[in-house]
Amino acid sequence: SSGEKYIERINELNNSIPQEEITDGLYQTCDLLKQLNYLTENKDDNPKLTKLYDYYLPILVSALEKYKKLQDSKVINDDFKQTEAGLIKTIVLINEALKTIIGSMQEDDYMNINADVSTLQSLLKKDGYGSDPFGSDK
């Protein structure tokens, strides 16, 4: 899946980045992408993920690749430190976006489960199996 491709590439880049705040943030990014992959395993085309896979993650990977090149040049100056701080902030932002996407997808699942349960309860009551073992139909 697209998510697995990005997890693999981000991990690959992360292994060569010694900056702890960046690596910690990227570990979280990969964990969140794994959760997202699990949630979307059996779902077809989800518009919430289109921007993530078509825009956000490609830009993040591109920024990480450029950062790695700068880091490998061993020239650590104010511009580098400013760029590094911006990258850290961006990783925090993308992780928050991933959490929001995961949360909204779980909300959809909860609504679907509740709708299924409600429908099943109505059908059971209609067919004469209406006694509620928990006493909430009183």
Roles of regions detected by a PLM:
Residues 38-138:
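Long amphipathic all-alpha helical oligomerization modules
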Residues 1-42, 46:
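Membrane-proximal, non-transmembrane interface segments of integral membrane proteins
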